[in-house]
């Protein structure tokens, strides 16, 4: 199933809020996981696993390091 950018953003915001405690309203496409949202590598792995389950995509560990912003993850899921 193809998801819209808004559906993915809303889903990611919910996941990030649950895992890292960042309010969903602060999660916007241009935000960097490390610099803006203060998410560490362990939380990033948890977010990736939750996103894989929610959106039915696979995000290999070697790809995870290239996903620096929320928009990067949105683009990856839409591929």
Curated annotation (Swiss-Prot):
Record-annotated Carrier domain positions: 6-79
Database matches in Pfam families: PP-binding
GO cellular component: cytosol; membrane
Alphabetic keyword roster: Cytoplasm, Fatty acid biosynthesis, Fatty acid metabolism, Lipid biosynthesis, Lipid metabolism, Phosphopantetheine, Phosphoprotein
Signal peptide, first to last residue: none
Modification after translation (UniProt): 4'-phosphopantetheine is transferred from CoA to a specific serine of apo-ACP by AcpS. This modification is essential for activity because fatty acids are bound in thioester linkage to the sulfhydryl of the prosthetic group.
Lineage: superkingdom: Bacteria
Pathway: Lipid metabolism; fatty acid biosynthesis
Compartments, record wording: Cytoplasm
TM region positions: none
Gene Ontology terms for molecular function: acyl binding; acyl carrier activity
Residues with PTM O-(pantetheine 4'-phosphoryl)serine: 41
Coiled coil: none
GO biological process entries: lipid A biosynthetic process
Its job: Carrier of the growing fatty acid chain in fatty acid biosynthesis.
UniProt record similarity statement: Belongs to the acyl carrier protein (ACP) family.
NCBIfam families, per the entry: PRK00982.1-1 (NF002147), PRK00982.1-2 (NF002148), PRK00982.1-4 (NF002150)
Stated name of the protein: Acyl carrier protein
Organism: Thermobifida fusca (strain YX)
Lineage: Bacteria, Bacillati, Actinomycetota, Actinomycetes, Streptosporangiales
């Amino acid at each position: 199933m193809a998801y819209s950018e808004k559906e993915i953003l809303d889903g990611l915001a919910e996941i990030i809020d649950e895992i890292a405690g960042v309010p969903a309203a602060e999660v916007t496409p241009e935000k960097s996981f490390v610099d803006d949202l203060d998410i560490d590598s362990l939380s990033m792995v948890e977010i990736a696993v939750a996103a894989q389950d929610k959106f039915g995509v696979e995000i290999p560990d070697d790809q995870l390091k290239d996903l620096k912003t929320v928009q990067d993850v949105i683009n990856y899921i839409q591929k």
